[in-house]
Design a protein with these regions (language model features):
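Short glycine-cluster motifs
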Residues: 1-61
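Peripheral docking tails and interdomain loops at the edges
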Residues: 61-138
């Protein structure tokens, strides 16, 4: 529905699960898609920001893009009700590394769980869901 219409159909994009927003958001942010996902049939949202892997136009810095994305994630977390986790894959570039640490602190201060890898986030989400399922059975 509405979520699928937002995403283009470029070759290589995964349009089911997970949703690939890699060709958007670097200057405009990702608030719009996050807001749509809050209404869609999505149970849990993991936002992955792969530092050092962005294919950005030359005029856009990776640090600027990171700030825009984190701002939108924090805004959606405050306004929405869906459980969210954020993964910021690390980079070895000194300037970017400092920005990553600062944004991780911003996300944690907003109450969002922050992970360094998708696998670490997936394990934590799995445990979170199993814990809640166990509580529901009691």
């Amino acid at each position: 529905g509405e979520l699928r219409r937002h995403f283009n159909n470029d070759p290589g994009l995964i349009l089911h699960n997970p949703i690939d927003e890699s060709t958007h958001g670097f200057t405009d942010g990702i608030y719009g898609p996050l807001k749509i996902m809050q209404k869609a049939e999505v149970d849990f949202l993991m936002v992955h920001i792969p530092m050092g892997m962005f294919l950005l136009p030359q005029a856009i810095s990776e640090v600027t893009s990171l700030k825009v994305l984190v701002k939108d994630v924090v805004r959606m977390h405050r306004e929405g009700s869906m459980p969210m986790a954020v993964v910021i894959s690390h980079t070895i570039l000194p300037d970017t590394r400092v920005a990553v640490i600062e944004r991780q602190e911003t996300l944690a201060a907003a109450g969002l769980p922050v992970f360094n890898s998708v696998s670490g986030a997936a394990r934590a989400i799995d445990r979170f869901i199993k814990w809640h399922e166990g509580r529901a059975e009691v």
